[in-house]
Amino acid sequence: MSFCVYGTDVALCNNEHVVIHNIENGAENTIRLPDLQTEKKIDSHNNANIESFHAITNVTFSNDGKYFFVCTNRKQLCLYERKNRNLLSNRTLARAASKVQFTRSNDIVVADKAGDAYLFSSSRSDRGILLLGHLSMMLDVLVTENEKYIITTDRDEKIRVSMFPNSYNIVSYCLGHTKFVTNILELPHDKTVLVSCGGDGVFILWDYEIGKELLSVDFCNKIPKRDIEKFNQQLQDYHLDESVEILPVKHLRLSALDGTSSLAVMSFYNNSLLLVYIISGTVKLQFEITYVQSIVIDDEPLECHLYKDNLWVLSELGFKVYEFKENNFIPNDKINCKLSQLNNLWKTLRNDSIKQNLFPILYKRKYDNVQEYLERKKTRLANITE
């Protein structure tokens, strides 16, 4: 499930439809995704599956609001014009995407679950260009605002900085995380700095061009122990042997406050908590990260966005918007009173949506066949002795 905001437009999606709702005048446009285009032969038993079970995993407006793309778990990537809703391209990806982003020039970069990153043009409908590959599943991808570098993360704790688009030239590695890295973003008030977080309970500031860690902040003590115990139980339910001491970060959102400070908001998998921090300072000045508040909503945030000092949160219960005022997020009653139509729409879409639990793929299953081998050996030796 995904949504995005630009101006007064809110794009909301479920399995097969995107609805763009204008919160000022209440206008709605519903777009049904086109059929999947593929040259590969699909077996009949899988064909029905593809058309009946496909969920939109990402819908995003470009930075200038000219375009938006829709990406689904059936490897479909569609690009539209925002104003007239025209379909510009309908592509089939090589593999399912794990993260999709616009570049500053409105091209699209896709990181997939096999560890590859592709670049797709917004002006041409040709096939994507393979940029680079990891040996592990990619979890996030970022093309810097100056379009000089592409930064990628994976499930094996690595952050790789490469030249863009000639990504065979590796600039540096940012090594410091001890678990998978789910989110990377440029610091809004100082684009030479990278902010990262994931499954190890810290978020780190980097001088990414040289792979140097500038500051690391631990947020483990902000998570209630009962929430961690509940999460560990869910890991066991998925037959994962791992036990964690911190919740993995689901979303990291940043927004500039002024020329020397930015807001940071984190949400977590299977938890209703949002943590808010202020990052102040620059590379030339000393960085400082200050805890601001914890926001507890009624359910796990399915998606959240920072847009013009407003925090938009979507949960199973609908949308809620907070405004940053006097160093705290408080409910934005001016916008929330306009969301009744949007929330009614969400209730309809929610009933048709396919629920997905994505966090289990972040943790690796451990297979121990040594004990089984020893038991077989013991039995074999016993038979020989007899």
Describe every region a protein language model picked out.
Residues A11-I42, K75-C78:
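Beta-propeller domains
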Residues M1-F3, N47-F61, R95-F102, S136-V143, ...:
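Canonical WD40 repeat/beta-propeller blade segments in eukaryotic WD-repeat proteins
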